[in-house]
Amino acid sequence: MELMDDDGSSSLLEELMAPLRRGTPTTTPEDLWLQAYPMMMSPMCGDGVMLGDLLVGGGNARNTLASPPPPSFPLPVPLTTTTPCPPLHEVSFEFDSIDCLGEVCNPYKRSGGAVRATAAAQVMVAAMDPRREAASSAVAVAAVEEEERCKARRGAGGGGDSGELAPMFVFGGGGGAAASVRPRSCRPPQPGAPSKNLMAERRRRKRLNDRLSMLRSVVPRISKMDRTSILGDTIGYVKELMDRIKNLQVEAATGDSSSSSTENLSMLKLNTLKPPPSSSSGEETPLIRNSTRFEVERRENGSTRIEMACAAIPELLPSTLAALEALGVEIEQCVISCFDDFAMQASCLQDDKKREMTRDTEEIKQTLFRSAGYGDGCLI
């Protein structure tokens, strides 16, 4: 059924709709948008607020992550009232805030029933802590010291790795923490290969034992064979030698020292003797040296003491011993010196039969005189 006038216009319909038009103002969606955001411009224009600011900030410019715009740009009026932005470590991430038909996720859209990422926030805060850097540097220093000890052990073992470092990174937990280098584990020394330190210690002990052996051979009195006793006895012996040196220096300064060898030599000096001419030859025998002496003395116990001093001639000792043996004289003790001249001191025994045949000591003396090459002459 159509409500039309005679002229064909829909006047009835217009009359029915007129009260509605007078009571409700005519508004379009564009008018509503401009009323909410009066400064909203075209996307092609550089002024105003962009669509991304509305989606991220929820209509409130204070809640945006970016820096606030300059004060010359007036902020739009938000469509709805929003709560202040919580701190970063209390941000709630909701899967419900993701719009499957949109391209932008607003994490501040809802506040309830969220899974908080506190672990990630704590990691970021710890990464910015200065104590974390100190701990990382301490780890690096410990790694370097461990590598030096490993090098020393490898050098002592005579083999092993070349000392290179394995690039193993130890992360500090995020946030740009410094990475340290950890050395490779030290390989144990090869079996059968002696350590350099062990060989050096063996050589040192061998030298010490050799020196102790030399010291033990020099010191005359060693109580025990251990090292402590050897050193103690050596110190005592050195002190004794020092005391002897001091005493000898004192005696040499005072002139009290006497030599027994000088006295023995003075006893051998005699006056000049001239033997008679030899009957076998017309030539005279040369003068006897002032040190020539022939003495024979009988003792009460039956022994005979013989003292002889003359010039040294070839085969003097064998001829003298043969002459004494011919007389039956047996030498018990004899001291002979051939330093410059020939000298002999002897203590002899004689058989009873030979003693009866020998009248006196003069016969023994003449025998010694002839054995010395002085002919048949007698001593004056």
Swiss-Prot record:
| Protein name per its UniProtKB record | Basic helix-loop-helix protein 004
| Family affiliation | Belongs to the bHLH protein family.
Q: Where is this region: Helix-loop-helix motif?
A: 206-241
Taxonomy, superkingdom: Eukaryota
Q: Per the record's keyword annotation, is Magnesium included, yes or no?
A: no
Q: Kindly name one Pfam family recorded for this protein.
A: HLH
Q: Which GO molecular function annotations are given, in alphabetical order?
A: DNA-binding transcription factor activity; protein dimerization activity; sequence-specific DNA binding
**Which cellular component terms (GO) are annotated to the entry?**
cytoplasm; nucleus
Organism, as annotated: Oryza sativa subsp. japonica (Rice)
Give all residue intervals belonging to the bHLH domain. 192-241
- Tell whether S-adenosyl-L-methionine is among the UniProt keywords: no
Instruction: Classify the main location.
Output: nucleus
- Residue ranges, annotated region (Basic motif): 192-205
Q: Which InterPro entries match?
A: bHLH_dom, HLH_DNA-bd_sf, TF_AMS/ICE1/BHLH6-like
Localization per record: Nucleus; Cytoplasm
Name the gene.
BHLH004
Q: What GO biological process terms are annotated to this protein in UniProt? A: regulation of DNA-templated transcription
Task: Tell me the function of this protein.
Answer: Probable transcription factor.
Stretches for region Disordered = 180-202, 270-289
Q: Which keywords does this chain's UniProt record carry? A: Cytoplasm, DNA-binding, Nucleus, Transcription, Transcription regulation
Cross-referenced SMART domains, in alphabetical order? HLH
